[in-house]
Amino acid sequence: MPTPKKGARLGGSASHQKKILSNLAASLFEHGAIKTTDAKAKTLRPYAEKLITKAKSGTVADRRNVLALIPNKDIVAYLFDELAPKFENRAGGYTRIIKLENRKGDNAPMSQISLVLEETVSAEATRAARAAASKQTADEAQVEETPAEEVTEETAAEETTEAAQADEAPAEEAPVEEKKDEEK
Protein backbone atom coordinates (compact mmCIF):
# COMPACT_ATOMS: atom_id res chain seq x y z
CA MET A 1 0.00 0.00 0.00
CA PRO A 2 1.50 3.38 -0.98
CA THR A 3 2.19 5.87 1.76
CA PRO A 4 0.40 9.23 1.58
CA LYS A 5 2.67 12.07 0.46
CA LYS A 6 0.50 15.12 1.12
CA GLY A 7 -0.52 14.48 4.70
CA ALA A 8 -4.02 14.57 6.14
CA ARG A 9 -6.87 15.95 4.03
CA LEU A 10 -9.63 18.22 5.27
CA GLY A 11 -12.82 16.18 5.31
CA GLY A 12 -11.14 12.89 4.43
CA SER A 13 -11.02 12.80 0.63
CA ALA A 14 -9.45 15.10 -1.94
CA SER A 15 -12.80 15.95 -3.54
CA HIS A 16 -14.28 16.84 -0.15
CA GLN A 17 -11.27 19.06 0.60
CA LYS A 18 -11.77 20.92 -2.69
CA LYS A 19 -15.40 21.60 -1.81
CA ILE A 20 -14.50 22.71 1.71
CA LEU A 21 -11.86 25.14 0.40
CA SER A 22 -14.24 26.43 -2.27
CA ASN A 23 -16.94 27.15 0.30
CA LEU A 24 -14.49 28.68 2.79
CA ALA A 25 -13.03 30.97 0.10
CA ALA A 26 -16.51 32.03 -1.01
CA SER A 27 -17.44 32.86 2.59
CA LEU A 28 -14.17 34.74 3.10
CA PHE A 29 -14.73 36.90 0.02
CA GLU A 30 -18.38 37.48 0.90
CA HIS A 31 -17.92 38.42 4.57
CA GLY A 32 -14.31 39.64 4.68
CA ALA A 33 -13.47 37.46 7.69
CA ILE A 34 -14.45 34.00 8.88
CA LYS A 35 -13.87 32.00 12.04
CA THR A 36 -12.63 28.45 11.46
CA THR A 37 -10.13 25.89 12.77
CA ASP A 38 -6.39 26.50 12.52
CA ALA A 39 -5.88 23.69 10.01
CA LYS A 40 -8.59 24.99 7.69
CA ALA A 41 -7.34 28.57 7.97
CA LYS A 42 -3.76 27.55 7.16
CA THR A 43 -4.93 25.51 4.18
CA LEU A 44 -7.28 28.25 2.97
CA ARG A 45 -4.67 31.03 3.00
CA PRO A 46 -2.65 30.04 -0.12
CA TYR A 47 -5.83 28.96 -1.93
CA ALA A 48 -7.52 32.33 -1.38
CA GLU A 49 -4.38 34.33 -2.16
CA LYS A 50 -3.99 32.58 -5.52
CA LEU A 51 -7.60 33.42 -6.36
CA ILE A 52 -7.06 37.08 -5.45
CA THR A 53 -3.92 37.19 -7.61
CA LYS A 54 -5.94 35.84 -10.55
CA ALA A 55 -8.65 38.41 -9.85
CA LYS A 56 -6.07 41.22 -9.95
CA SER A 57 -5.16 40.39 -13.55
CA GLY A 58 -8.85 40.49 -14.48
CA THR A 59 -8.69 38.53 -17.75
CA VAL A 60 -11.62 36.50 -19.02
CA ALA A 61 -9.57 33.30 -18.76
CA ASP A 62 -8.76 34.01 -15.11
CA ARG A 63 -12.40 34.76 -14.40
CA ARG A 64 -13.40 31.40 -15.89
CA ASN A 65 -10.70 29.59 -13.90
CA VAL A 66 -11.96 31.16 -10.68
CA LEU A 67 -15.56 30.32 -11.63
CA ALA A 68 -14.49 26.68 -11.97
CA LEU A 69 -13.21 26.76 -8.38
CA ILE A 70 -15.94 28.95 -6.84
CA PRO A 71 -19.23 28.24 -8.64
CA ASN A 72 -21.05 31.30 -7.20
CA LYS A 73 -21.14 33.97 -9.94
CA ASP A 74 -22.09 36.78 -7.58
CA ILE A 75 -19.11 36.21 -5.31
CA VAL A 76 -16.72 35.89 -8.27
CA ALA A 77 -18.08 39.14 -9.72
CA TYR A 78 -17.61 40.83 -6.33
CA LEU A 79 -14.06 39.44 -6.13
CA PHE A 80 -13.08 40.71 -9.58
CA ASP A 81 -14.96 44.02 -9.57
CA GLU A 82 -14.69 45.27 -5.98
CA LEU A 83 -12.04 43.35 -4.04
CA ALA A 84 -9.29 43.08 -6.68
CA PRO A 85 -8.92 46.88 -7.14
CA LYS A 86 -8.37 47.21 -3.38
CA PHE A 87 -5.35 44.89 -3.66
CA GLU A 88 -3.73 46.57 -6.69
CA ASN A 89 -0.88 48.10 -4.65
CA ARG A 90 -0.28 44.95 -2.59
CA ALA A 91 2.14 42.34 -3.96
CA GLY A 92 0.93 39.54 -1.68
CA GLY A 93 -0.20 38.88 1.85
CA TYR A 94 -3.86 39.50 1.15
CA THR A 95 -5.03 37.53 4.19
CA ARG A 96 -4.30 37.57 7.91
CA ILE A 97 -4.73 34.73 10.40
CA ILE A 98 -5.43 35.62 14.03
CA LYS A 99 -5.41 32.91 16.69
CA LEU A 100 -8.52 32.69 18.88
CA GLU A 101 -9.49 30.67 21.94
CA ASN A 102 -10.09 26.96 21.57
CA ARG A 103 -13.60 25.85 20.67
CA LYS A 104 -15.77 25.05 23.67
CA GLY A 105 -17.15 21.65 22.63
CA ASP A 106 -14.08 19.77 21.39
CA ASN A 107 -11.26 22.16 22.38
CA ALA A 108 -10.22 22.54 18.73
CA PRO A 109 -7.77 25.41 18.09
CA MET A 110 -9.66 28.21 16.34
CA SER A 111 -8.51 31.09 14.15
CA GLN A 112 -10.00 34.03 12.33
CA ILE A 113 -8.84 34.48 8.75
CA SER A 114 -9.59 37.88 7.27
CA LEU A 115 -8.78 39.96 4.22
CA VAL A 116 -6.21 42.71 4.72
CA LEU A 117 -7.96 45.73 3.22
CA GLU A 118 -5.74 48.45 4.72
CA GLU A 119 -3.74 50.57 2.31
CA THR A 120 -0.12 49.58 1.93
CA VAL A 121 2.54 52.17 2.56
CA SER A 122 5.39 52.07 0.07
CA ALA A 123 9.00 52.28 1.16
CA GLU A 124 9.34 55.65 -0.58
CA ALA A 125 6.45 57.07 1.40
CA THR A 126 7.95 55.91 4.69
CA ARG A 127 11.32 57.42 3.74
CA ALA A 128 9.65 60.71 2.86
CA ALA A 129 7.76 60.71 6.16
CA ARG A 130 10.94 60.01 8.11
CA ALA A 131 12.80 62.77 6.26
CA ALA A 132 10.03 65.25 7.00
CA ALA A 133 10.01 64.23 10.65
CA SER A 134 13.78 64.61 10.95
CA LYS A 135 13.66 68.05 9.33
CA GLN A 136 10.93 69.09 11.72
CA THR A 137 12.92 67.92 14.75
CA ALA A 138 16.02 69.70 13.42
CA ASP A 139 14.02 72.92 13.05
CA GLU A 140 12.66 72.53 16.58
CA ALA A 141 16.19 71.96 17.90
CA GLN A 142 17.37 75.21 16.30
CA VAL A 143 14.41 77.06 17.78
CA GLU A 144 15.19 75.63 21.21
CA GLU A 145 18.88 76.55 20.95
CA THR A 146 18.19 80.24 20.32
CA PRO A 147 16.26 80.82 23.57
CA ALA A 148 18.85 78.76 25.42
CA GLU A 149 21.58 81.22 24.41
CA GLU A 150 19.47 84.14 25.58
CA VAL A 151 18.87 82.38 28.88
CA THR A 152 22.59 81.80 29.35
CA GLU A 153 23.27 85.49 28.74
CA GLU A 154 20.65 86.42 31.34
CA THR A 155 22.05 83.95 33.86
CA ALA A 156 25.56 85.25 33.21
CA ALA A 157 24.34 88.78 33.92
CA GLU A 158 22.65 87.60 37.11
CA GLU A 159 25.83 85.80 38.19
CA THR A 160 27.89 88.97 37.74
CA THR A 161 25.46 90.98 39.85
CA GLU A 162 25.49 88.27 42.50
CA ALA A 163 29.29 88.22 42.41
CA ALA A 164 29.38 91.97 42.86
CA GLN A 165 27.04 91.69 45.82
CA ALA A 166 29.15 88.87 47.23
CA ASP A 167 32.26 91.06 46.97
CA GLU A 168 30.54 93.82 48.88
CA ALA A 169 29.25 91.52 51.59
CA PRO A 170 32.64 90.25 52.76
CA ALA A 171 33.89 93.83 52.87
CA GLU A 172 31.10 94.69 55.27
CA GLU A 173 31.68 91.55 57.29
CA ALA A 174 35.38 92.10 57.55
CA PRO A 175 35.09 95.12 59.85
CA VAL A 176 32.74 93.15 62.07
CA GLU A 177 35.33 90.44 62.45
CA GLU A 178 37.99 93.02 63.18
CA LYS A 179 35.78 94.55 65.83
CA LYS A 180 35.38 91.15 67.46
CA ASP A 181 39.13 90.69 67.44
CA GLU A 182 39.64 94.14 68.92
CA GLU A 183 37.21 93.42 71.74
CA LYS A 184 39.17 90.42 72.88
Curated annotation (Swiss-Prot):
Residue spans with biased composition (Acidic residues)?
141-161
Keywords on this record?
A: Ribonucleoprotein, Ribosomal protein
One GO process term, biological-process aspect: translation
Q: Where is this region: Disordered?
A: 126-184
Q: Which GO terms describe its molecular function?
A: structural constituent of ribosome
Q: Which Pfam families match?
A: Ribosomal_L17
Entry GO terms, CC: cytosolic large ribosomal subunit
Q: Which domain of life is it from?
A: Bacteria
Q: Which PANTHER family match?
A: LARGE RIBOSOMAL SUBUNIT PROTEIN BL17M, RIBOSOMAL PROTEIN L17
Outline the subunit composition: Part of the 50S ribosomal subunit. Contacts protein L32.
Which family is annotated?
Belongs to the bacterial ribosomal protein bL17 family.
- Record-given protein name: Large ribosomal subunit protein bL17
Organism equals Corynebacterium efficiens (strain DSM 44549 / YS-314 / AJ 12310 / JCM 11189 / NBRC 100395)
Q: Which gene encodes it?
A: rplQ
